[in-house]
Every structure is written in structure tokens, then in C-alpha cells.
Amino acid sequence: MASSLKLGLIALLGATAVNAAPAAEPVLGTSLLTSRASCTFSGSSGAAEAIKSKTSCSTITLSNVEVPAGTTLDLTGLKSGTTVIFEGTTTFGYKEWEGPLVSVSGTSITVQGASGAQLNGDGARWWDGKGTNGGKTKPKFFYAHSLTNSKIENIYIKNSPVQVFSINGAKELTLSGITVDTADGDSNGGHNTDAFDVGSSNGVYITSPIVHNQDDCLAVNSGTNVHFTGAQCTGGHGISIGSVGGRSDNTVDGVTVESCTIKDSDNGVRIKTVYGATGTVQGVTYKDITLSGIAKYGIVIEQDYENGSPTGTPTSGVPITDLTLDNVHGTVASSGVDTYILCASGACSDWSWSGVSITGGQTSKKCKGIPSGASC
């Protein structure tokens, strides 16, 4: 009897042990959670290690990383909720290629610069005065593509070889406290160093950027619900819509540019559409814009661009409607033009201008198709 009880007890304990086996699963779960930890990468191997480990880290800190020549710091496809922090100085090896130097994508992503951090493109190695129009092949800097409900903040970019931020396919993306400093390019052949190029995005909010460059401070080529506020733009070509037309997406709808200063630039406010193309520009507002030291045009709106240059002949395929200019004021050089409007017949309508005062330059005798509510 005792022997039978003993055997029964052993069998019972064994069955209990088997039934208890699933209790080990929470331990595995805990292990999986800890794999999404904070990771720090640095030095010449930092880029490769970060790329390899990017989906295993909840926080990716890049400390004085040296990105090899011809390599993208590829942080695309990050897990939702990942934070990327740049510390110290991030540098990039030299090679003639198209780039980008950095690329980030994902949902609920935060990209931020620590205090004193800098992404230094050392663009003078590529600058030849030609930008993307010839000469050396130059890498674009930062692709912010396919970012959803994300933010990029307190990033300082120094001396980009060519265009800086390419924002494409973004939804609800905020960029705040961004500095784009390519001032050295003024005297060293910097060209086409656009700060922010926006395309095919819905909900882009760029606040308080400080920009010194040699091309557009902002260029919205397509997209909806784009807000550009509190910008300080120096040098370059002004704050632009377009050129619109000739791409797969040719709709600009709902752009607000507000409380910005533009100084020592070729242009102030600029809207340009492509000759012979189709598309739409509507719901654009420029409000509380201050211009100073503008060399060519204080306000320039034209529907005649072809191959990057004006033709003098506007076409109506990309109408410009519901355009508001409110308190846009400032000065243009005596050799420049205060306001220039070149619209095809009936292609510009429903414009509202108030408090617009551009002085110092010449009055254009070539304006055409000026809609009611505007003056040239």
C-alpha cells in the first residue's frame, strides 16, 4: 500500500510539473522586452552597428559616429516608438554619390539632437558652384521619408553638400528647433542647398528653424496641410511653393507660412508652376512675413517655369487659387523688383492681399494676368 501511494504521489507531482510548464512563458516575454533596450554607438564602426541593431533598440544614441564614405546611416524601418539621439559630432566620409547621408522612417519616431550636437557634412569637399546641375555628384543629407506621427527636434546641420531635408510621404510630422547652417557656402561654391523640400505629405509642421543657405528655405512641391512658422531665413532663394507640376503628385493644398523673416535672399515670397504641366495650388497663406535685403524679387508668382528657368510665357494647367498674403512687408535692392506676377488668363483667382508693402525695388512692367485683390 505504501509503495502504491508513493508511486501515485510521484505520478501526481509529474503531472503537476507538466501542467506548470507554461508558467515559464512570462520569463521569455521579459527577455524579449529587455532586448529593446537603450543602445549607444560611436566611432567608425558606430554606423554599421546601429544599422544592424536598429530594430533591437528602443533608444539609439549615436555618439561621435563616423559614417563611412558612400554609406547611408540607414535608420529606416524603425520599430514604433523608437528614439534616436545624436550626440557630439556626426561626420561623413567623402565620396561622389547621390546619398542620402542619413535616412529615417517609421511610426511614432523621435529624432533629437543632444545639447551641442552637430551633423557636419563638410560640404566644401563637394562644393563647386554647380549644386545638382553638374560637376561633382553630391549626396543629399537627410531623408525624412515615410515618417508618421513623428518628430525631429533640435538638430543642427552644418555645411550640407547639397539639399538638406527631403520630406516625402510623411503624415503628421513635426520638425522643431532645426538649424541649417551652410553659411560657409556663400563664398565657397555652395549651391542648391535647400533646407526643407516637402513632397507628397499630409501634416508637416516646421517650427522656428534657423536657416542660412544657398537655395530655398522651404520648397513645397506637393502636399497638404503644411505649416512653416517662426523661421529665420538668410541667403538662399526665399520661401517657395514649387515648382509645381511635372511630378507624380502635383497638388499643393493648405500651406501656411507665418511669422517668418527672410533676409539677404534672392527672393522673398515665391510661387512657381511648370510650363505646360497640370496640377493645383490652392489654400496658400503667407502671413506676417518680413523681408530685408532682397536682391531680385520681393514677391514673385509665375506660371512659366521650364527646366528650372522662367520662359516668360505662362500656362494655365496649374491654377493658383485661394492665395492670401497678409502683412507681407519689407525691402528690395534698387536693382531688384518689388512684385512680379505672371499668370495665364483666368489661371489665378480668389486672391486676398492685405497689408502688403514691398519697397525699394523697381516696379515691373511685365506683369500679366493679375487677379482681383492683388497688385503688381
Swiss-Prot record:
Residues 1-20 form the signal peptide. GO terms for molecular function: polygalacturonase activity. This is Polygalacturonase. It comes from the Eukaryota. The active site is at residues 215, 237. The lineage of its organism: Eukaryota, Fungi, Dikarya, Ascomycota, Pezizomycotina. It catalyses: (1,4-alpha-D-galacturonosyl)n+m + H2O = (1,4-alpha-D-galacturonosyl)n + (1,4-alpha-D-galacturonosyl)m. GO terms for biological process: cell wall organization; pectin catabolic process. PANTHER family: POLYGALACTURONASE. It comes from Penicillium griseoroseum.
